[in-house]
């Protein structure tokens, strides 16, 4: 029997990288990574550099992929101002065109196409606008304003109606994983902030707001969910929330992070990382040389500290976002991960990869 072939779109991102790592260990799968830039991690898969915003580039670069059976789409366009860009109409338009360019090309090229997994998140419930009904369920009504999740879902479901393949939408919470140059990588933000604090000989102080309960999703869990939805008929044309299965409070995780880096844990001190951290770019360069780390600049690892401020709740009132996992569990996917242990595991992995100092 011929192998299945998975096309990972957004292959250098947190979800893409974890999906490639997971499927590389499975028998019967060939992989293709799709990204604007060359791979920045070790893998032996086929890799295609393509501008997803260009329909012509997608047609030309993807025309040889005539045997793709599955697609995991996790690519996203973000503006420099990040959170404020989420409510702008051109942000939605660009993200829709990227998806459309890939799917239209692959639908034309590959007669073997079976399934497409599309990544979303809590913006589907208006999480970027403020509090929403909790726990959020897949059947909840939409929120107001431009939202590329809605545009992508509407287009994909309409386009698929006359096709033989099907789709599944996964909605994780805050995604944790290992990747460079991702504007939404909170692990890199935690690790570089801790490393710089240690180098300055100051305690590790939580820089965000008051205590609040949060949820997270490990990118490794998402990769396993991508595998599950891809071969279970019950998941055809369905939307699923997917989280680790527990909750966390940043203030409880911080002492464990301090212990991992061998430093003192200090009392919380609210501060804007957007304002303070870029000033440490030269110091980070000295840290990379001192500990013989891979040559990533601070802006490579954390392109946007605005996301860290947002997720740590700096200058915000507590705004918990909780989603129900009941649907995906009832349908047969019951995997889970301990969030506090996950944070430490991923930081250790970045240390082992010589991205962060030990």
Predicted regions and their residues:
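N-terminal Rossmann NAD(P)H-binding glycine-rich loop of SDR-like oxidoreductase domains
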Residues: 3-28
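Active-site beta-alpha turn of Rossmann-fold NAD(P)-dependent dehydrogenases/reductases
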Residues: 10, 75, 117-120, 171-173, ...
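Conserved glycine-rich Rossmann-like NAD(P)H-binding loop of the short-chain dehydrogenase/reductase
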Residues: 27-40
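NAD(P)H-binding glycine-rich loop region in Rossmannoid oxidoreductase-like domains
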Residues: 39-97, 101
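Short-chain dehydrogenase/reductase
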Residues: 51, 88-96, 134-135, 142-154, ...
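Conserved Rossmann-fold NAD(P)-dependent oxidoreductase catalytic core, especially the SDR/UDP-sugar
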Residues: 70-75, 83-148
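NAD(P)-dependent short-chain dehydrogenase/reductase
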Residues: 158, 162-224, 257
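Mid/C-terminal beta-alpha module of Rossmann-like enzyme folds, strongest
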Residues: 223-312, 316, 324-326, 330, ...
């Amino acid at each position: 029997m011929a192998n299945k072939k998975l096309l990972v779109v957004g292959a250098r991102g947190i979800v893409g990288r974890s999906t490639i790592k997971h499927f590389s260990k499975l028998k019967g799968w060939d992989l293709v990574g799709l990204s604007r830039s060359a791979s920045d991690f070790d893998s032996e898969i086929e890799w295609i550099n393509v501008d997803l915003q260009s329909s012509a580039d997608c047609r030309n670069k993807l025309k040889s992929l005539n045997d793709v059976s599955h697609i995991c789409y996790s690519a996203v366009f973000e503006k420099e101002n990040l959170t404020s860009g989420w409510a702008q109409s051109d942000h939605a338009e660009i993200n829709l065109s990227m998806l459309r360019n890939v799917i239209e090309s692959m639908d034309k090229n590959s007669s073997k196409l079976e399934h497409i997994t599309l990544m979303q998140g809590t913006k589907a419930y208006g999480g970027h606008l403020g509090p929403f009904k909790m726990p959020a369920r897949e059947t909840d009504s939409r929120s107001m304003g431009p939202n590329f999740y809605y545009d992508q879902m509407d287009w994909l479901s309409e386009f698929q109606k006359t096709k033989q393949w099907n789709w599944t939408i996964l909605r994780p919470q805050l995604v944790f994983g290992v990747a460079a140059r991702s504007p939404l990588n909170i692990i890199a933000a935690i690790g570089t902030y801790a490393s710089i604090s240690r180098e300055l000989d100051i305690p590790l102080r939580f820089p965000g707001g008051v205590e609040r309960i949060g949820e997270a999703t490990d990118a490794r869990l998402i990769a396993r969910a991508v595998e599950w939805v891809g071969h279970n008929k019950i998941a055809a044309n369905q939307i699923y929330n997917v989280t680790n299965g527990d909750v966390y409070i940043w203030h409880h995780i911080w002492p464990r992070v301090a212990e991992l880096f061998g430093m003192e844990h200090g009392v919380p001190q609210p501060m804007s990382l957007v304002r303070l951290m870029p000033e440490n770019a030269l110091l980070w360069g000295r840290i990379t040389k001192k500990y013989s780390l891979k040559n990533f600049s601070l802006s490579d690892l954390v392109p946007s500290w605005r996301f860290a401020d947002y997720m740590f709740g700096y200058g915000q009132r507590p705004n918990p976002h909780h989603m129900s996992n009941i649907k995906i569990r009832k349908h047969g996917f019951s995997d889970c991960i301990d969030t506090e242990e996950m944070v430490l595991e991923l930081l250790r992995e970045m240390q082992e990869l010589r991205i962060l100092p030990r």
